Amino acid sequence: MDLREITDFNAPELDVYARLTENQLVNRADPDNALFIAESPLVIGRALDAGCVPVSFLMERKHVEGKAQGLLERCPPDIPVYAAPLEVLEQLTGFKLTRGMLCAMRRPKLPSVEEVCAGARRVAVLENVMNPTNIGAIFRSAAALNMDAVLLSSAGSDPLYRRAVRVSMGTVFQIPWTYFPEDAPWPEGGMALLRRLGFKTAAMALRDDSLSIDDPQLLAEQKLAIVLGTEGDGLAAGTIAHCDYTVRIPMAHGVDSLNVAAASAVAFYQLGKD
């Protein structure tokens, strides 16, 4: 273990934790050096399980020989481990750390839509979902409630943003996911790609002609893509028009909509049944 006590907040090797934005970590100009931040021992462990490559750790000093010991034993011995008391770490990062531990990791190469959909029966499609907290919650529900993959439009939030990874409890590393490619952009290109792969599409939207989510037609589909829209406006009208089904969640007490993360959990539970 290459243990390094933090003595200089301005050290360039700490930029990844203290000064680089999420967009800078993505590093689209040099994707081979793109990074993400995993937060908490559980999330870091799940990232390692998925084969993600660690670059460095930042943690409370007390965790080096405590909660982090098993994680560090799984990493090469020359991985830098930056350590300090919790108050110093929070002053450095500018946010409250969950479980006092961060790990900078290489961003994995994303698979193709065809690869993540191979053998899949149920996939979630996220159209322009912008809030990382919602992204993380949707991934957690997708992994728990029988979705086989998650597909995202390019305009949505990144599932590897620190907050999304943390809220997902590391399930972003447990369920296959990717973006629709530039040569098949969402919605028209992505919809055509899903059809070529044998999927029917179900738009989650409140329309007069919507099917109830418990309609037997939906469960009878061998391959179904469940399409969820952005916060506030929901799915674009053009997206709904291109889908095979429009589906609603029945609601009581005059409530007219659910948060996209809550709606996803209901949809995945009902439509993900075997």
Positions of predicted regions on the chain:
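Active-site/ligand-binding-proximal alpha/beta "capping" segment
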Residues: 202-255
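RNA substrate-binding interface of SAM-dependent RNA methyltransferases
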Residues: 108-209
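Structured adenosyl-cofactor binding patch, chiefly the S-adenosyl-L-methionine
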Residues: 101-103, 141-145, 156-173, 237-274
